[in-house]
């Protein structure tokens, strides 16, 4: 026959071209069968899988081929023209006859392979050496091809489609690869019920990301292999289809549909033995629909309706609404199973079930308190993700972190190594010196080195011993897990003798060894006075460290109990916010109630309306609160409400609605809280905002949440809401001057508030706190605080100043103004003190002075 491209499939023709390149590469004049076989086992996946199915070794075939090729005559240079050898011509003719006997339209890889197995030049001997003859090849090819015929030039992509584009979950469950599934019995039972229907037997699992949709399918796979399912699902194969792999590389129109049809044909021809699982099932809508081609969902619909294809889908609530609900014909073919987020108690049970898998993988122990902390803290602090996924991630990362510490050099030993290197460098430097002082230093360094090296040796030995103990425990746990898998397999195969031998012999022995080793380590640790270099148990502290990294919450704030942390809050605030004891006490009391769990947990930690004249400490209280509770003044989100005087400006706070410019950017408030959920939010001069803008405050104050422009819930439960206002400030100043009682001032201001704010707004606040006007005594304390800040800045410059009471009284007198509060103090210090100091610093550079005494002479600050 003529060798024409039209007679071959794409892959078989590619192999012949590669054979030509092989012949050229070896400087051979003729293209022969050995070149073709080499190209098949080098480049072609189908040829490799056929040989592997025949239990042949690719490496051995390559070795024998190379030996044969080396002994063939070759030219000195690469030949320009090549000729087809008689054996190759005969093999191609033979493959054409095999094609006709198979009733195929094109010569494909398997035809070439069968023809090569009959080649008398070398291929037959090489394949026979691996116990591969034409009969064995035919049997293996029949298994791979099934009933498919070669009707186009790309048939190889349709062979074993499920193996290529799917993952056998029942096989993975049998091998113990899948994690155990704890709980979720109702959801699995409902899924089995739907799968057992006659028609429309296709469940779709709908739930938020991370609630365990895929885990339910894995749980079903485990039930199938354990026989814990109705007869309709006994011995079925559960295969997860990879839509990404199915679409990837389908460059020609219709290629994707061909692949999908091959998969569906394989599923339907199994007579219900295969159940298909499509994760992210919304991807089938529109998949492959380019240039007018039909999408995947339209190929699935008829088979789903007739019950020929049993398919489990999984998707999120949003994706289901956006993609599947738009296609009612597809939606009605699936029966919905809603998967809700598990409770904290259920999550702890799930974590306890998974604990062993993670212990074996990481080679560490995980304490039960760590599991409880992971569930509770992830639910409290990680608001945008769902249980149990976020809790499992916490355990995984904490265990990974500890494993990394175990394999790395301990910090104590690393410090000693660095000190030794430093002393050795000093020793080399001192050896060049010959004076007596250098010799004494050298002797001291030698003594220090000897001491450090002795300590280094001891710590190294201890580290190796501890590491070895942990590795031994890890190895024993892995062995126990392997034996448990073997026991399960033996029970499934009803090999009860083998199961009993493993369970009461091997497993018992390993468990005893593990217990003895753990007891020995515990005794050694208790007897040993030395502190351990390595930890092998994940504790609650490890969980809090990981959460601190994820959410930027200061670590110490989680490790301390809420009560301990807040006991001295009032004193600390009073030291920074002067003259407002009632206000500070009200704020501290409210936060203490919130943090000790006595107030409503669904509301913000505290919500306060601070009223009073300018400069009395309203904003300062917010900053101080942020610093004390969250370790940084940057944890304060400041929203200036004078910028929100128009009704439409609400979109700047929560984000523009869909279709408007700025929708993707999000809102100033919503995005700030999403990024920093643990912060003090200051709404400054709240009375200046439009009343409609204030309406969004109602749900924040009442329920601790806000829905932004994108429809996402923003959690305000861990924020402190502070609103400041100048309402009633004139009355406060006037009545303070008349020395009225605080209660009377409070009553007057509260009555004025009703003219500015709606009752439903005022009623939702924890406290309405009225700040008094500052007295002269308060101003003196503020002066001292401001002077301390100046001193701290001067200390960096290497300068010191001393002030007597006269200077403090003078600054307080000059800055005293009941209307403006403490703000003039800052200006007085700036103009009268800092300006002169700046000039003195410039002079001191030439005079080399570093200490100044301040005094008041002739109503002026003087430096001595």
UniProtKB/Swiss-Prot annotation:
It is found in: Cytoplasm. Residues 5-147 form the Clp R domain. It holds the Pfam family AAA_lid_9. ATP 1 binds at residues 207-214. Residues 342-552 are annotated as: Linker. GO terms for molecular function: ATP binding; ATP hydrolysis activity. It comes from the Bacteria. Residues 8-72 are annotated as: Repeat 1. Residues 160-341 are annotated as: NBD1. Signal peptide: none annotated. Residues 774-864 are annotated as: C-terminal. Keywords: ATP-binding, Chaperone, Coiled coil, Cytoplasm, Nucleotide-binding, Repeat, Stress response. The keyword Iron does not apply. Residues 84-147 are annotated as: Repeat 2. ATP 2 binds at residues 612-619. Part of a stress-induced multi-chaperone system, it is involved in the recovery of the cell from heat-induced damage, in cooperation with DnaK, DnaJ and GrpE. Acts before DnaK, in the processing of protein aggregates. Protein binding stimulates the ATPase activity; ATP hydrolysis unfolds the denatured protein aggregates, which probably helps expose new hydrophobic binding sites on the surface of ClpB-bound aggregates, contributing to the solubilization and refolding of denatured protein aggregates by DnaK. NCBIfam families: chaperone_ClpB. The Clp repeat (R) domain probably functions as a substrate-discriminating domain, recruiting aggregated proteins to the ClpB hexamer and/or stabilizing bound proteins. The NBD2 domain is responsible for oligomerization, whereas the NBD1 domain stabilizes the hexamer probably in an ATP-dependent manner. The movement of the coiled-coil domain is essential for ClpB ability to rescue proteins from an aggregated state, probably by pulling apart large aggregated proteins, which are bound between the coiled-coils motifs of adjacent ClpB subunits in the functional hexamer. This is Chaperone protein ClpB. It comes from Prochlorococcus marinus (strain SARG / CCMP1375 / SS120). The gene is clpB.
């Amino acid at each position: 026959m003529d060798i024409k491209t039209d007679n071959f499939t794409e892959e078989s023709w590619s192999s012949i071209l590669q054979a030509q390149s092989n012949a050229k590469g070896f400087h051979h004049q003729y293209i022969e069968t050995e070149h073709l076989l080499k190209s098949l086992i080098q480049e072609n996946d189908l040829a490799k899988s056929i040989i592997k199915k025949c239990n042949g070794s690719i490496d051995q075939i390559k070795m024998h081929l190379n030996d044969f090729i080396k002994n063939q005559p070759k030219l000195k240079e690469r030949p320009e023209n090549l000729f087809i050898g008689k054996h190759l011509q005969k093999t191609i003719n033979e493959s054409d006859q095999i094609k006709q006997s198979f009733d195929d339209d094109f010569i494909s890889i398997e035809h070439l392979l069968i023809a090569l197995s009959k080649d008398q030049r070398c291929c037959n001997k090489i394949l026979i050496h691996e116990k591969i003859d034409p009969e064995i090849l035919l049997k293996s090819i029949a298994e791979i091809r099934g009933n498919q015929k070669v009707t186009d030039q790309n048939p190889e992509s349709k062979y074993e489609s499920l193996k290529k584009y799917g993952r056998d979950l029942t096989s993975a469950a049998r091998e113990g690869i899948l994690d155990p599934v704890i709980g979720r019995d109702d959801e699995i039972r409902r899924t089995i019920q739907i799968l057992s229907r006659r028609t429309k037997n296709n469940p779709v699992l709908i739930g938020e990301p991370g609630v365990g949709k895929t885990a339910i399918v894995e749980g079903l796979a485990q039930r199938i292999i354990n026989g814990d399912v109705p007869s309709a699902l006994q011995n079925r194969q559960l295969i997860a289809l990879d839509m990404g792999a199915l679409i990837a590389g389908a460059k020609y129109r219709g290629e994707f549909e061909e692949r999908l049809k091959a998969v569906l044909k394989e599923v339907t021809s199994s007579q219900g033995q295969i159940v298909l699982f499509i994760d992210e099932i919304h991807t089938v809508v529109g998949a492959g629909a380019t240039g007018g081609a039909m999408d995947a969902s339209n190929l699935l619909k008829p088979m789903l309706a007739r019950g020929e294809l049993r398919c489990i889908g999984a998707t999120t609530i949003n994706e289901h609404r956006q993609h599947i609900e738009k296609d009612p014909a597809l939606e009605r073919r699936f029966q919905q199973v809603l998967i809700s987020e598990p409770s904290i108690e259920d999550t702890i049970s799930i974590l306890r079930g998974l604990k062993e898998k993670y212990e074996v993988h990481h080679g560490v122990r995980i304490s039960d308190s760590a599991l409880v902390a992971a569930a509770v803290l992830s639910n409290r602090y990680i608001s945008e993700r769902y249980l149990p996924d976020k809790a499992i991630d916490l355990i995984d990362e904490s265990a990974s972190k500890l494993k990394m510490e175990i394999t790395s050099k301990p910090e104590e030993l690393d410090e000693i190594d660095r000190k030794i290197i430093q002393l050795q460098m000093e020793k080399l430097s001192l050896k060049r010196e010959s004076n007596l002082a250098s010799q004494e230093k050298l002797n001291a360094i030698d003594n220090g080195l000897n001491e450090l090296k002795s300590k280094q040796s001891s710590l190294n030995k201890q580290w190796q011993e501890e590491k070895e103990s942990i590795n031994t425990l890890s190895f024993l746990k892995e062995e126990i897990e392997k034996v448990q898998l073997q026991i399960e397999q033996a029970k499934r195969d009803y090999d009860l003798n083998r199961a009993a031998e493993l369970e009461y012999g091997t497993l018992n022995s390993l468990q005893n060894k593990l217990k003895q080793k753990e007891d020995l380590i515990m005794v050694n640790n208790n007897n040993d006075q030395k502190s351990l270099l390595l930890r092998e148990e994940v504790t609650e502290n490890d969980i809090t460290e990981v959460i601190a990294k994820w959410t930027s919450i200061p670590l110490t704030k989680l490790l301390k109990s809420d009560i301990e942390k807040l006991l001295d809050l009032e004193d600390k605030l009073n030291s920074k916010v002067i003259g407002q004891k009632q206000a500070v006490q009200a704020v501290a009391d409210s936060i203490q109630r919130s943090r000790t769990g006595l107030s409503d947990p669904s509301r913000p930690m505290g919500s306060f309306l601070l009223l009073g004249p300018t400069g009395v400490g309203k904003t300062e209280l917010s900053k101080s609160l942020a610093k004390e509770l969250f370790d940084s003044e940057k944890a304060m989100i400041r929203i200036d409400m004078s910028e929100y005087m128009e009704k439409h400006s609400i979109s700047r706070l929560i984000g523009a609605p869909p279709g408007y410019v700025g929708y993707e950017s999000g809102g100033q408030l919503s995005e700030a809280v999403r990024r920093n959920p643990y912060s003090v939010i200051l709404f400054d001069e709240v009375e200046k905002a439009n009343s409609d803008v204030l309406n969004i405050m109602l749900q924040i104050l009442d329920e601790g949440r806000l829905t932004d422009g994108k429809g996402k819930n923003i959690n305000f439960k861990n924020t402190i809401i502070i609103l400041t206002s100048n309402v009633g400030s004139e009355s406060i100043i006037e009545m303070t001057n008349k020395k009225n009682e605080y209660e009377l001032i409070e009553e007057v201001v509260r009555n004025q508030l009703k003219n500015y704010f709606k009752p439903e707004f005022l009623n939702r606040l924890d406290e309405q706190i009225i700040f008094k006007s500052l007295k002269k005594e308060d101003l003196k304390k503020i002066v001292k605080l401001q002077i301390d800040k100046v001193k701290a800045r001067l200390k960096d410059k290497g300068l010191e100043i001393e002030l007597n009471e006269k200077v403090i009284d003078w600054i307080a007198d000059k800055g005293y103004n009941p209307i403006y509060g403490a703000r003039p103090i800052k200006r007085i210090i700036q103009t009268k003190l800092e300006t002169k100091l700046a000039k003195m610093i410039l002079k001191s550079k030439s005079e080399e002075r570093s200490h100044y005494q301040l005094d008041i002479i002739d109503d002026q600050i003087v430096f001595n």
